[in-house]
């Protein structure tokens, strides 16, 4: 079924019969308030309205119409695209917010089949280290394993293993040749922290594997020798990689994990569009980041467009995402600058005040519909406004390829910050990147207010708040994917691509929205995927 956006049911067309265009088409944008039209065969000057008469919609304004289905929810394919070059097993992304995504969240998202975007409210070195931690968290074969020299001390080995949360380190000489290995077992009863590793490491009968060893072959070697780490060496004895039993077990534990060609978890990271953004981009790329996100509040500004073009020219092979936009023109402008995905959403987030502070924005469903038209074949990321799993289904049905979530994930174990108790319940903090405190910590450039040091000189576009503690993010993702599967089953779509093209929406009234939620009862026990 060909489409430029999802179709709307007859009831919606009837409800909007007074409009002259469907809700996905823009009204004339002539800011001068005049234009040419043909009256009785002659051109005449006429005044054009500056107010678009078509109704802009958000998720609560519509429902998807059930359709004939031959697909069971458990059999649907939830894979989609994050960018032109990055696939997802589930179309869910964690937002680049400093109360949502650091390395713990990014690791959990990738293991579930999604991806996390590391926030940029940190130093360049720390953000690059966060990328490195995600990439090192698991691997088919670690291509550049952390190493030590035989002259290093037990103290240095302990510090290194604690820092990277690893249980062993290969020991190499000045030429990179493997001379031994040190593990937690070697150090468990070592009391002399200044003892050189040459006296503590295992050097005799080292078990190694040649370059080209498969993971299945490596597993057999590890099991045969009852060891946990297998150095990979070339014919000269030079260390070329490391295979661990932990990574092999994780491959079975997380079969849907989103990994790169080397078996490492995928991760994206945010940069700005001014200042040292190019230095930050280089550091992230050197650390192995899979995608760069130029993260701004207004992606259809010349500064952002220029920065996007600069990054694309400097790094033609990196997967590049930019935003945020809310119109077809904004999406088209970013695509013309070479992005691999467009991020959509101006003001829909629960912690965002952009629309009331500035008076600017587009309700998220309409923003997605229009941006998908402008982006063409380039994936669209729907950023913000997701309260329930059904909202994610609607965003994907509107044409988005993935959905970005912030506040929904802020209360999970993997989000930055500690949980706190209030009136007997556990909470975690969440704040918009446009909140006053976040802007003071480094996100002011996202709102084009960089350089302002005094809080009194900042104009925030977000708030700080708290959300209930939700436990592991895997529990939240399980419910989100379960709702997505059920939604796909109801509308008869076996794939995300079919969901993006086939279903119909119907516009609903406030009475219809009330009817959609639990009503006429007192909830005595909340469901894991629904709360008021």
Spans of model-derived segments:
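Alpha/beta catalytic cores of nucleotide-metabolism and tRNA/nucleoside-modifying enzymes
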Residues: 8, 12-68, 148-149, 210, ...
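Bateman/CBS regulatory modules and CBS-like beta-alpha motifs in cytosolic regions of diverse proteins
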Residues: 76-88, 95-97, 126-164, 171-173, ...
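Active-site-adjacent beta->alpha loops and helix N-cap segments on the catalytic face
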Residues: 124-132, 238-258, 276-278, 297-317, ...
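Glycine-rich phosphate-binding active-site loops on the catalytic face of alpha/beta enzymes
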Residues: 114-126, 289-301, 343-358, 386-419
């Amino acid at each position: 079924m060909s489409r430029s956006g999802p179709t709307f049911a007859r009831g919606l067309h009837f409800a909007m019969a007074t409009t002259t265009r469907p809700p996905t088409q823009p009204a004339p944008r002539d800011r001068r308030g005049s234009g040419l039209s043909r009256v009785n065969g002659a051109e005449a000057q006429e005044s054009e309205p500056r107010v678009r008469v078509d109704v802009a919609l958000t998720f609560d304004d519509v429902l998807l119409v059930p359709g004939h289905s031959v697909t069971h929810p458990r059999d649907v394919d939830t894979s989609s695209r994050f960018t032109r070059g990055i696939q997802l097993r589930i179309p869910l992304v964690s937002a680049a917010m400093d109360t949502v995504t650091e390395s713990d969240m990014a690791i959990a998202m990738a293991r579930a089949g999604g991806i996390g975007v590391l926030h940029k409210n940190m130093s360049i070195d720390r953000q690059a280290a966060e990328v490195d931690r995600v990439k090192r968290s698991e691997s088919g074969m670690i291509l550049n394993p952390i190493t030590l020299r035989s002259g290093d001390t037990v103290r240095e080995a302990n510090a290194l293993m604690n820092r990277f949360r690893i249980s062993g380190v290969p020991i190499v000489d000045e030429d990179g040749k493997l001379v031994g290995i040190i593990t937690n077992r070697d150090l468990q009863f070592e009391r002399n922290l200044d003892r050189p590793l040459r006296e503590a490491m295992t050097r005799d009968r080292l078990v190694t594997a040649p370059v080209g060893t498969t993971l299945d072959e490596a597993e057999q070697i590890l099991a045969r020798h009852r060891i946990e780490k297998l150095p990979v060496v070339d014919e000269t004895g030079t260390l070329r990689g490391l295979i661990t039993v932990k990574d092999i077990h994780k491959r079975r534990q997380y079969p849907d994990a989103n990994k790169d060609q080397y078996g490492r978890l995928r991760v994206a990271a945010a940069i700005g569009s001014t200042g040292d953004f190019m230095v930050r981009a280089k550091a992230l790329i050197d650390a192995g980041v899979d995608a760069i996100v130029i993260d701004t509040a207004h992606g259809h500004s010349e500064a952002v467009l220029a920065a996007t073009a600069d990054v694309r020219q400097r790094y033609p092979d990196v997967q590049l995402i930019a935003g945020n936009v809310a119109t077809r023109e904004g999406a088209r402008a970013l695509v013309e600058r070479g992005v691999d995905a467009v991020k959509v959403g101006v003001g829909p987030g629960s912690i965002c005040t952009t629309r009331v502070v500035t008076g600017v924005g587009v309700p998220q469903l309409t923003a997605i519909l229009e941006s998908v038209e402008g982006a063409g074949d380039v994936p669209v990321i729907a950023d913000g406004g997701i309260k329930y799993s059904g909202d994610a289904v609607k965003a994907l049905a509107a044409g988005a390829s993935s959905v970005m979530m912030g506040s929904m994930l802020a209360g999970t174990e993997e989000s930055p910050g500690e949980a706190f108790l209030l009136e007997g319940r556990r909470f975690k903090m969440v704040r918009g990147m446009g909140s006053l405190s976040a802007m003071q910590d480094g996100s002011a450039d996202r709102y084009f207010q960089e350089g302002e040091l005094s809080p009194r000189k900042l104009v925030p576009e977000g708030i700080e708040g708290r959300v209930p503690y939700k436990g592991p993010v895997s529990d939240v993702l399980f419910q989100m994917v379960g709702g997505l599967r059920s939604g796909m089953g109801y509308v008869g779509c076996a794939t995300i691509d079919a969901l993006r093209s086939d279903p119909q929406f119907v516009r609903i009234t406030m009475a219809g929205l009330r009817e959609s939620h639990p009503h006429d009862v007192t909830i005595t026990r909340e469901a894991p995927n629904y709360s008021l």
